[in-house]
A protein has these predicted regions:
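S-adenosyl-L-methionine-dependent methyltransferase catalytic core, i.e., the SAM/SAH-binding region
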Residues: 2-388
Length: 388
C-alpha cells in the first residue's frame, strides 16, 4: 500500500518528538495577502494601514486562550468514516481551526498523521496545544490553503493520503467579538482570518464603489437587495463598526422582508468576509492542488456552507472525474481525456436532523468527497463507491 508518511526525528532515534509548529514569521510560506489596486476593483487600503496596529493588538491575545477554539466538529462521524480506507501517511487538514476533526482522525487511525494548515495564527496555536499529545504525528504550518504545496515542502512531505477542507468562518472566530465577523457584537470592521494581512472589512465597506459593492453582495451573499444596501453604505460612509454597518443594512431592507429569514445583515456580512479573505477566489486552485498531491486510494473531502463554495467544489471534482472531457455526454469519449478521481458520492451529503438540532451552525453544511484513482479513460470505472 502506498504511503505518504515522512520520517520524523522521533522515528529516527526512538525519542518522542513534540508537534512541529511552523510560523510565517520564519518567512517559509508566502501566505500574506497583498491587495490589488483600484484598477482591479479593490479600493484604497490606506484606511486599513492606519488601524492595523490597533486591531492586531486586540487580536494578539487570542493564542493565550486555546480552549476558546474548541468547538463541535461538523459531520464528525462521517468525516472519520470516509478516511477509514485511505493509505497510511499524512492527511492534510487544510482548515485546521481548533483541530477538532484532526483530533478525531488521530484518535481513530494510528496509521495516520496530520499536516494542519490555517491562515489564522491564533487557531494554529490553539490546535498545537490541543494536539500536542500526539507528538510527531501532528505538524502545523501557518498558511493559506492555496499554498498547500509550499506548506508540504516546508514540512518535508511529498505526498498526502488525503485532504480535508472545512470551509468558511469557524464558530470561535464568529464568537470572538473583536475579530469583526459577527453582526451581533460591536467591533471594528475587521473580518480578516489572517490578521497580518493589510486588507480588512473596513477597506471593502469604505473603499469600494457602488458597483463593486453590488457585485460583492450579489456574488458572495446571494443578496437580492444588494443595490439598496450598496447605496445605503455609500450614503453613510465612513462606517467604523460592525453594529453600525448592521444597522445600515437592516434599514435598507424592506420591513416586511426583515421579519423573516434570520438576521437581515447575515448575507451581507458573509459576502464582505468572503471578499476580504478571497475565499471563493483561492478555492479552485487549492482543490486541484490537493487532488494532485493525494496518493492513489486517498480521499479529498470538502465541507462547504455557502452555495458559491459548493458550486466550486462540485465543478472542480467534476472536472477531475471527467478529465475535462469535451465529448457529447451521450457518446463514448474520443478526446483522450483521463479521469484522476471518482466521486465517493454523486450527491452532497448533509447533516442529520439530530446533528442540526444540537449544532445549528451545521444546518447549511454540504459534504462532497472524491477518491484518487489511477488515471484511466472516461467510462472504464464505476461512478461512485457509495450509495447516493
Amino acid at each position: 500500500m502506498s504511503s505518504a508518511h515522512r520520517q520524523s526525528p522521533g522515528e529516527q532515534d526512538g525519542s518522542p518528538t513534540p508537534p512541529a509548529y511552523i510560523s510565517l514569521d520564519r518567512g517559509d510560506i508566502p501566505a500574506t495577502f497583498v491587495p490589488r489596486g483600484t484598477a482591479d476593483g479593490r479600493g484604497d487600503r490606506s484606511r486599513s494601514e492606519r488601524t492595523d496596529s490597533k486591531r492586531d493588538q486586540r487580536v494578539s491575545n487570542d493564542a493565550d486562550d486555546a480552549d476558546f477554539f474548541h468547538h463541535v466538529p461538523v459531520m464528525a462521524a462521517e468525516i472519520v468514516s470516509l478516511f477509514a480506507t485511505v493509505p497510511s501517511g499524512y492527511v492534510l487538514d487544510a482548515t485546521l481551526g481548533g483541530g477538532g476533526h484532526a483530533e478525531l482522525l488521530l484518535e481513530a487511525y494510528p496509521s495516520l498523521s496530520i499536516l494542519g494548515i490555517d491562515r489564522d495564527a491564533s487557531a494554529l496555536e490553539a490546535a498545537s496545544r490541543r494536539l500536542g499529545r500526539f507528538g510527531n504525528r501532528f505538524t502545523a504550518v501557518h498558511s493559506r490553503f492555496d499554498h498547500l504545496r509550499t506548506a508540504m515542502n516546508t514540512a518535508r512531505i511529498s505526498e498526502i493520503s488525503g485532504a480535508l477542507f472545512d470551509l468558511g468562518v469557524s464558530s470561535p472566530q464568529l464568537d470572538r467579538a473583536e475579530r469583526g465577523f459577527s453582526y451581533r457584537n460591536d467591533a471594528p470592521l475587521d473580518m480578516r482570518m489572517d490578521v497580518s494581512q493589510p486588507w480588512s472589512g473596513a477597506d471593502v465597506v469604505n473603499g469600494y464603489t457602488e458597483d463593486q459593492l453590488i457585485r460583492v453582495l450579489f456574488e458572495n451573499g446571494d443578496e437580492r437587495f444588494a443595490p439598496r444596501i450598496a447605496r445605503a453604505i455609500i450614503a453613510n460612509r465612513p462606517i467604523e463598526s460592525t453594529t453600525e454597518l448592521a444597522g445600515i443594512i437592516v434599514a435598507a431592507i424592506p420591513a416586511a422582508v426583515r421579519r423573516t429569514g434570520g438576521h437581515p445583515a447575515k448575507r451581507s456580512f458573509q459576502a464582505i468576509r468572503i471578499e476580504v479573505n478571497r475565499e471563493l477566489e483561492i478555492l479552485p486552485d487549492a482543490l486541484d492542488e490537493a487532488i494532485s498531491a493525494t496518493v492513489i486510494g486517498g480521499r479529498v473531502a470538502v465541507l462547504s456552507y455557502h452555495s458559491g463554495e459548493d458550486r466550486i467544489v462540485k465543478e472542480r471534482f467534476r472536472s477531475a472525474e471527467t478529465g475535462d472531457c469535451v465529448c457529447p455526454p451521450n457518446l463514448p469519449c474520443v478526446c483522450g481525456a483521463l479521469r484522476t478521481v471518482r466521486l465517493v458520492r454523486r450527491i452532497a451529503k448533509t447533516p442529520t436532523t439530530d446533528e442540526i438540532a444540537g449544532n445549528r451552525r451545521a444546518a447549511s453544511a454540504r459534504l462532497r468527497v472524491v477518491e484518487k484513482i489511477e488515471q484511466d479513460v472516461i467510462g472504464n470505472l464505476d461512478e461512485t463507491t457509495e450509495p447516493r
